[in-house]
Amino acid sequence: MAHGARLGSVVTFVQDLDRSVSFYTDVLRLEVADRSATAALLVSPTGAQLILRAMGSNAPHTLGNVGVQYVIWAVDSQDDLDLCERVLRERSAYRQTRGSEDVTAVEGRDPDDIVVMITYRGPDQAPLRTLPVRIYGW
């Protein structure tokens, strides 16, 4: 492993598969590569993979407990980030936009109230050098 590991896929449990597939294909422009009655594999042109698995309408998700809190996605341009923000607003899923001199982040919530954050200038262009203060607010 001379170059270290890289993220391969993200698995997210959701309440309603159709609703979540619609959200992620619309907001992040992912495409459905495979699908069953209870799961879907969504992929991006860059190779990012999101696996959604339906857990039913009563499945809880609590922010702040042990486990992955959310995934931060990165786009290639400010125009792409603006498009993500617009789609989040159209879906009434937009929460806020924050920026620094290096990175701008748009935050929304998916249909299961899971945080979705999208940044322009991802880690390949603007790697983190310090811990983000936001992690202490959960």
Can you say where each PLM-predicted feature lies in the sequence?
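Short helix-capping and inter-helix turn/linker motifs at the boundaries of alpha-helical repeat units
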Residues: 1, 61-62, 96
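N-terminal beta-strand motif that seeds the catalytic metal site of vicinal oxygen chelate
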Residues: 1-18, 70-71, 125-138
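Vicinal oxygen chelate
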Residues: 6-15, 61-87, 90-138
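Short N-terminal helix-initiation segments at or just after the protein's N-terminus
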Residues: 9-21, 49-57, 82
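Conserved active-site tyrosine of GNAT-family acetyltransferases
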Residues: 20-25, 113
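Conserved short beta-strand elements that form part of the metal-binding/catalytic scaffold
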Residues: 31-66, 109, 115-122
